[in-house]
Amino acid sequence: MKQIRITRSYGVVTFETVSIDTSENVFFTNMDTEQPHWPELSTNQLGPAPSPNSSQCTVPQPKSPLLPPFPYVCRYRCKISGHENEVGVINVFNPLAAGTTTLPSARVGTPIASPVQVVTGGMSPYQISDQVFQVTDNNGKIQRGSGSIGPGLKLQPSSDSTGITVTGTPTVVGTYNFTFIVNDAKGANLQQVQYSMAVA
């Protein structure tokens, strides 16, 4: 749940801009000691929201028969007469989640034909850490390492908040197993996901 602070500075009222994913709610805290405020999501776009200082407020999706594109922007304003110039913005993203965990088989020395989406959603930029891999060949010989997801492979984070893909050219025949940690720009964390790919 994300807090949205309502503040006043030199006579200007500001509704804090926040970024959330679709699994999160928001709540408003009025820190303006001079006046009350009542944020309301734009009725022509997203419908009304509860009044400030409630325990939680659901941010609805656009009224459309189709799923909204992500990320999308929810705009709202104060519904108190005379306060219509007080507006706020909520950036809404898909949750950070694991994508494909069993990757399509690949051939040694051949570039992966299409990048494989291993992480979806979240807010870019992404921070990737703790990459660990193990490759087991057809004779049972094991190669372990860290700092990458395996010989010839790499993680490619997107800049448009769509997630992370695997690209590259595998250089070892065998089964690649790897894991890594991802943190996104709004503080979401994804870890302890096991991925695998067979290379012939």
Give the role of each language-model region.
Residues 53-55, 160-165:
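Aromatic sugar-binding surface patches on proteins
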Residues 1-111, 118-127, 134, 151-156, ...:
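Extracytoplasmic copper-binding redox domains, predominantly the cupredoxin/blue-copper superfamily
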Residues 61, 66, 165-173:
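Extracellular/luminal low-complexity segments enriched in Ser/Thr/Pro
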Residues 157-159, 170:
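Short, low-complexity Ser/Thr-rich regulatory SLiMs
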